[in-house]
């Protein structure tokens, strides 16, 4: 469950380390984002020679949440931290590698690239 001001780790190789959610996209009254939702983020911490720099604003898709994802069979998939993957304006991933596991909920037409790059799909 991600809302405005939430700090997230970055799960790709764009050079960003931590980002802050500045908006949950998808309706004017939308308050929370979960796995698979698109948010607007600001880069708070970045590597010196990365693709992105501190202060830049990007779209990102949430790939892991500490709150977890409830499956139809009743199981709950939780993670230790919140993580996102940075996207460009066409909603394609900027990075070429994904770090850590992602959930099966990302397996939609929009995010198949992220699922295929991920080392593990839970």
Swiss-Prot record:
Keyword RNA-binding: yes
Keyword rRNA-binding: yes
Entries under InterPro entries matching the protein: Ribosomal_uL14, Ribosomal_uL14_bac-type, Ribosomal_uL14_CS, Ribosomal_uL14_sf
Keywords, comma-separated and alphabetical: Ribonucleoprotein, Ribosomal protein, RNA-binding, rRNA-binding
Superkingdom per UniProt: Bacteria
One GO process term, biological-process aspect: translation
GO molecular function, one term: large ribosomal subunit rRNA binding
Known role: Binds to 23S rRNA. Forms part of two intersubunit bridges in the 70S ribosome.
Name this protein carries in UniProt: Large ribosomal subunit protein uL14
Gene3D superfamilies: Ribosomal protein L14
A Gene Ontology cellular-component term: cytosolic large ribosomal subunit
